[in-house]
């Protein structure tokens, strides 16, 4: 009897811990958003105006360009690939905390427009982390388009410029053949990616 009671207490404690950890993880999305927004504001000097937008004609949006970049980076840190899931489920809990939140369609359009701003912020953060390093190393990773068996039938990227078409290759570190592209990244000695 006491053994069954002890086991049931362990399971109830595990269930309570699991509930607390999932609530804590959900809370972290807004916390990460605020922290990433502060970092973006710190490194956006001379890139945006006082309201956090890239200077352009037209009405000033209430949800700033820096907030779009910060929300995009926050979703990346949480490994959220689906914008639908992010807006329909994850951000519903934080509507009170983020009052001027835009729709998913507007977010997608503005994220594409702010890609240059995001890239410039990434370069500034990388420069701050690495300093003025003079030595770099190149690392590469295969980006597989399709399986090797389907490579000859794959039409993706074959029209037009053949110098940019996917090709067969071998990855020595993974000891595998692949059909696709090879992504090269220029990294500093501390491991920060400078360009790709």
Please state what every model-predicted region is.
Residues 2-196:
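Short alpha-helical elements
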């Amino acid at each position: 009897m006491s053994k069954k009671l002890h086991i049931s207490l362990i399971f109830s404690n595990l269930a309570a811990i699991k509930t607390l950890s999932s609530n804590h993880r959900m809370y972290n999305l807004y916390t990460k958003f605020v922290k990433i927004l502060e970092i973006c504001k710190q490194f956006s000097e001379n890139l945006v105006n006082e309201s956090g937008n890239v200077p352009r004609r037209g009405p000033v949006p209430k949800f700033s360009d820096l907030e779009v970049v910060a929300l995009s980076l926050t979703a990346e840190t949480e490994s959220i690939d689906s914008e639908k899931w992010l807006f329909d489920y994850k951000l519903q809990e934080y509507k009170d905390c983020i009052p001027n939140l835009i729709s998913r369609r507007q977010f997608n359009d503005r994220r594409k427009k702010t890609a240059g701003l995001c890239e410039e912020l990434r370069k500034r953060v990388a420069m701050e982390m690495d300093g003025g390093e003079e030595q770099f190393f190149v690392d590469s990773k295969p980006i597989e388009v399709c399986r090797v068996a389907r490579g000859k039938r794959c039409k993706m990227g074959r029209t037009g410029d053949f110098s940019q078409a996917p090709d067969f290759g071998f990855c020595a570190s993974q000891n595998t053949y692949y059909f696709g592209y090879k992504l090269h990244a220029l990294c500093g000695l501390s491991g920060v990616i400078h360009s790709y």
